[in-house]
Amino acid sequence: MKTAHELRPGNVIMLDGSPWVVQKTETTRSGRNAAIVKLKLKHVLQDSSTESTFKGEDKMEDIILERLDCTYSYFADPMYVFMDAEYNQYDVEAENLGDAAAYIVDGMEENCQVTFYEGKAISVELPTSVVREVTYTEPSARGDTSGKVMKPATITGGGTLSVADFVKTGDMIEIDTRTNEFKKRV
């Protein structure tokens, strides 16, 4: 059993007797009340999705599924194809990846974990951090440097996130894939 706060994209939970893949999590904390967790869920067996809200300490039944370490191979619209060490290929639907699709790029060296339910590849868990190139960001703002100054940036793969003011186009940065946050320049 996991609490709602411990769930991450790619986890599979049993909700109302059905398996659901967590595609996105958003935690909101307030000063007096408990944390609230919004989950974007996709049904494993049917083509439906939903958003649900839970208290941070609500218990969820985490389904133990088969997981394989795989590397990204190629994109065949609408499927991402991953390959294991024995050269077996597994197709994962693009919509099952959720926000993770922004970090999957050709030639990526990081291994991913492909999750299977009843023999079907249903989701992909990325490593906790990846290194990507900044393809576009605005130049630094001079003078406005009190506190932590962040600016938007686009990375290889098309994802966007906020980066530190000193990051320039062409820089390699490390990103936390669980929170979509800039960690450091590499």
Swiss-Prot record:
Where in or outside the cell is it found?
Cytoplasm
Gene it is expressed from: efp
SMART domains to which the protein is assigned, alphabetical:
EFP, Elong-fact-P_C
Q: Which Gene3D superfamilies match?
A: 2.30.30.30, Nucleic acid-binding proteins
Q: Which PANTHER family does its entry note? A: ELONGATION FACTOR P, ELONGATION FACTOR P (EF-P) FAMILY PROTEIN
Top-level division of the source organism's lineage: Bacteria
**InterPro entries reported in the protein's UniProt record:** Elong-fact-P_C, NA-bd_OB-fold, Rib_uL2_dom2, Transl_elong_fac_P/YeiP, Transl_elong_KOW-like, Transl_elong_P/YeiP_cen, Transl_elongation_fac_P, Translation_prot_SH3-like_sf
Q: What pathway does the annotation place this protein in?
A: Protein biosynthesis; polypeptide chain elongation
| Pfam families, A to Z | EFP, EFP_N, Elong-fact-P_C
Cystine crosslinks: none
Q: Which species expresses this protein natively? A: Shewanella pealeana (strain ATCC 700345 / ANG-SQ1)
This protein is called Elongation factor P
